């Protein structure tokens, strides 16, 4: 055991030899390195696999072991201050190491196929390997200054990968937006680190936690200053994990390659903020005000992310808002003291979201031969549909990932989300109501993504779609065609200016009167001569999907735990995660509310699953196949015919406002642009005017006046008698004028 711990410092450094080798190869033998570029994927996967084996061994030893601090070397600034660099191995570190390495390996394998035709193949592998190294260094750090160093490296790598296709202006703008937004949080994190060093005199976690466990108002520590420093640390996590109000960078980060989106959302950048709060949990739990703030921010974020996801057309952007919402659940769990539930959801969500993002990459790859290599088209769900018969393996894996995120048992996210919902109800009904409602909303927008992508018929060959208008009906009408206010409901068909039928002229007949029917959300297409259809990707891209599917199916079972009451009911007690997920420094004990008996578990599970099924049901009604079972029963049409027109008009207006608000990202970007961007520009213009007009004006004016006076004096003293006589008479005249007056 000690032998393994002795070499644990090697884990973050294992990907570095591959990075250095690729760099030397590009520098000394660039032609050969580029021609043989795909061979570099093997050593990248190999070295990260070695790191994974080390991580698994450490995790097994940590189940019944204790935390290990190991210092490698010390940088002494003076006799009173020194920085000690080392590593900390505890259950939290072990879990994060496994998470990063497993997801990282699968993303690397997937990237070999996804990026095979890209000119930046080698550059991508250098960036992603360094990204993994930075995150591994972050989770093994033993003090705050070491965390900050790797924290900045993670931010730098995300900047490089989000703007990987930097020749595209949108990608360049997106990476700048992510970088600037995270600067706010990183600055707060740095101030918080310096503040706690000033308060406690140490940057080591164990010293901070010992002091935090003992501080009370009588021990001389300023509680207001301590709370402020803790808030600044929390601000860093807010920015990195895309929490409200610093969440605006996350959807734009989808401009990077899809594999890096999977890695960012599953195991690296956005997980760093949750990891920081989990690492400092014994510190935060001693500050009730900060814990309340964490839970409030998490609650706002989980609801906001879900509402913003319901109207997006871009498949990756929809998944990005889903990540934002799920991170809000983790933040809420940490805020209410449910440490185990938060990290459990971090694990289950990581594998499910990696599966969904890699599946979306397969979808995008299959659409590119049809619509071109523009993300505005290849990622647009408006142009998809009916892909289940073209990419069946991707469809199956994507469906299981969707159901997992919806909270359907026995998939991974069901167990963790149900635990968070139960604890939130026990902590506060307010948090419980919002978290439960958002759980149903999650099922709605996730199943919407699935239906728009795989259900119905392929819509890419439709000629009259729009990609410019931003009406709310994008999320209702799959075609992106903004419907005018007055719609003739006697007809299902709609025509364009060119006279081309918007729907197929050969539509199946429906029983009953078609008059006063509402427009359906997808349709059946007639045969159309086409030469290209989506197709399944190669085995290199499918293999990671299948492995992640296994994780999604079975990883949730490690977190099933019941108390002794459950044992009496004959239910086996599985406490692997309970032994594993404990605070890194065991100074606090988790609330007993986190352990529930079988009756409470079944009650909470039934309610959460009912909400999820209701969300799936609503999504299927709105976005399912056009002639589904419910529509053939005239369920929607009978509701419309029996409802008052005023009520239906009001409902339509409310729906329009909601979808418009959601599609425009809650107008947060517009608000930030007008308040901060334009406000700063106006402030700079005012500063420029003050600097050049007033400050420079006074300085230049004094110089100009001095110059003019000097010129006049020079002119007077030029040696001309006429000038002397003229000024003599002028002075005499002025003197006489004042003397006489």
From Swiss-Prot:
Superkingdom as given in the UniProt entry: Eukaryota
Cystine crosslinks: none
Major location (coarse): plastid
Transmembrane segments: 9-29, 39-59, 89-109, 125-145, 147-167, 185-205, 219-239, 258-278, 280-300, 327-347, 354-374, 396-416, 425-445, 542-562, 605-625, 721-741
Catalytically driven reaction(s): a plastoquinone + NADH + (n+1) H(+)(in) = a plastoquinol + NAD(+) + n H(+)(out); a plastoquinone + NADPH + (n+1) H(+)(in) = a plastoquinol + NADP(+) + n H(+)(out)
GO biological process, one term: ATP synthesis coupled electron transport
Listed EC numbers: 7.1.1.-
Broad class of enzyme this protein falls into: translocase
GO cellular component, one term: chloroplast thylakoid membrane
Function: NDH shuttles electrons from NAD(P)H:plastoquinone, via FMN and iron-sulfur (Fe-S) centers, to quinones in the photosynthetic chain and possibly in a chloroplast respiratory chain. The immediate electron acceptor for the enzyme in this species is believed to be plastoquinone. Couples the redox reaction to proton translocation, and thus conserves the redox energy in a proton gradient.
NCBIfam families linked to this entry: NDH_I_L, PRK06590.1
Entry similarity comment: Belongs to the complex I subunit 5 family.
Subunit (UniProt): NDH is composed of at least 16 different subunits, 5 of which are encoded in the nucleus.
Name of this protein: NAD(P)H-quinone oxidoreductase subunit 5, chloroplastic
Organism per entry: Lolium perenne
Gene that this polypeptide is encoded by: ndhF
